[in-house]
């Protein structure tokens, strides 16, 4: 995978044409997934378990790639006169009638190219014309050429795919839950619910679970030293429990492990956890009961404990919670092209909190920029901080990365286990971008284009 767009470089992308994926794939049940994973693990025992964990999605996975042993057939060639103008420097007039997504098929392209370009068209949506005033005519001409803007495809006037699904926010992708105060204690009230989750607006919803009616659950954010009371009402038809992952408890009965530190929370029951947030850092909360199913279906969320004085300085913040069970490979409960891009202006520093709530390791690779890793599992690394462009995050781990944007462009940002990000229909799943613009005002322009 290469940079999707770098205004300083004329290189083409890997995929240059698009058509949406079929929505007729059946849903995958967690028991089915668990059986496959168990059998696969047994078959590969003795050194192959890692390979099993990193295997591609099953053929009938709702949002995974569709396996095919047959080669991709080339589409019929078309005459040069029927091809769109590759030198377009502006989007076609709004009065022009949009043609079907994908447009005329250039010679030599396959259905893979068609689908792949459509995914990127959906990801950028009406950001594409907005980028003209940000990157300038020359860079925009290259982007228009890559995406075939002369086709006047429908996505040019539609919001990006991530703005069409619920529970996504441009600030940090996960809105914090506002507490109430009770004698100095910060009280957070949440429900544990059965929900329908939209991984992508063009896909059917999946039957999932969520805290506060959403997956991931609302971010619980406090300051080091705060007394925290988390009250959960179980609206499920089954028992559950809630574990605050990474918290150092004075009272181990607050640890949230049914039949170890508590009885399970029964349907209709309200259960309270109370503790002092003694250590700052990027933490998580999730089910710790029937967890393969419940966490895999969405019972997870971020728990951030801010230090009283934060030595880490940054301009913007994002939280990425990865999961790889229900719905395939997701970032914050959504898969590409419905993932929220990281936005930054040249010179700004972005903090990204990686949290792996899945069952597989995911190595996050950022194109064109460097990540400085300043914390692991909530613990500051101090002088042991290191730089990298690929960061492996194991299940249960959290890393805090700083990215100082130095190069304008649309930079790919993805898991580097390739079957988690690309299939026969192009990019999907754990793919995102870092969109770096020349000035801070341009970030505001992008946001305005999305929410207008």
Which stretches of residues belong to each language-model region?
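N-terminal secretory signal peptides
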Residues: 1-37, 44-53, 59-66, 72
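C-terminal segment of N-terminal export signals and the immediately downstream linker at the start
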Residues: 32, 53-171
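Short beta-strand segments of immunoglobulin-like
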Residues: 177, 217-221, 338-343
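Histidine- and aromatic-enriched segments that form or immediately flank copper-ligand environments
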Residues: 187-304, 360-392, 414-432
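Beta-strand-connecting loops/turns
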Residues: 223-225, 268, 347, 396, ...
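Exposed beta-strand face motif in extracellular beta-rich ectodomains
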Residues: 281-283, 350, 409-411
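Low-complexity, Pro/Ser/Thr- and charge-rich linker/hinge segments at domain boundaries
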Residues: 306-321, 436-451
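Acidic-aromatic/histidine active-site loop/patch
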Residues: 316-346
């Amino acid at each position: 995978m290469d940079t999707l767009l770098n205004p300083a470089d004329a290189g083409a992308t890997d995929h240059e044409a698009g058509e949406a994926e079929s929505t007729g794939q059946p849903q995958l049940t967690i028991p089915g997934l668990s059986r496959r994973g168990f059998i696969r693990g047994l078959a590969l025992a003795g050194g192959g378990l890692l390979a099993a964990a990193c295997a591609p999605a099953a053929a009938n996975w709702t949002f995974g790639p569709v396996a095919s042993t047959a080669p991709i057939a080339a589409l019929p060639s078309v005459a040069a006169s029927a091809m769109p103008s590759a030198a377009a420097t502006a989007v076609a007039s709004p009065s022009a009638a949009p043609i079907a997504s994908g447009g005329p098929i250039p010679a030599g392209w396959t259905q893979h190219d068609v689908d792949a370009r459509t995914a990127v068209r959906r990801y950028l949506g009406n950001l594409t014309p907005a980028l003209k005033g940000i990157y300038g005519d020359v860079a925009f001409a290259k982007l228009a050429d890559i995406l075939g803007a002369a086709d006047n495809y429908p996505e040019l006037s539609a919001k990006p795919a991530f703005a069409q699904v619920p529970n996504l926010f441009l600030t940090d992708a996960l809105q914090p839950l506002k507490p109430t105060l009770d004698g100095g204690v910060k009280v957070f009230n949440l429900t544990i619910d059965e929900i329908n989750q939209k991984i992508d607006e063009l896909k059917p919803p999946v039957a999932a679970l969520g805290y506060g009616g959403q997956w991931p659950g609302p971010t619980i954010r406090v300051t080091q030293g705060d007394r925290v009371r988390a009250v959960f009402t179980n609206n499920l038809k089954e028992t559950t429990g809630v574990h605050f992952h990474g918290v150092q408890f004075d009272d181990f009965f607050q640890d949230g492990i049914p039949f170890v530190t508590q009885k399970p929370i029964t349907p209709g029951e309200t259960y309270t956890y109370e503790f002092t947030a003694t250590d700052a850092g990027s933490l998580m909360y999730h089910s710790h009961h029937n967890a393969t199913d419940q966490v895999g279906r969405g019972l997870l969320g971020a728990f951030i404990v801010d230090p009283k004085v934060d030595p880490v300085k940054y301009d913007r913040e994002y939280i990425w919670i990865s999961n790889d069970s229900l719905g395939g490979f997701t970032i914050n409960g959504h898969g590409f092209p419905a993932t929220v891009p990281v936005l930054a202006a040249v010179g700004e520093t972005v903090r990204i909190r990686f949290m792996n709530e899945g069952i597989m390791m995911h190595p996050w690779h950022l194109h064109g920029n460097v990540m400085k890793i300043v914390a692991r599992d909530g613990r500051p690394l101090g002088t042991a901080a290191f730089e990298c462009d690929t960061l492996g995050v194991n299940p249960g781990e959290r890393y805090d990365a700083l990215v100082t944007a130095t190069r304008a462009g649309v930079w790919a940002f993805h898991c580097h286990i390739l079957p988690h990000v690309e299939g026969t229909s192009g990019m999907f799943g754990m793919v995102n971008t870092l969109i770096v613009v020349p000035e801070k005002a341009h970030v505001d322009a992008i946001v305005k284009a999305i929410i207008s």
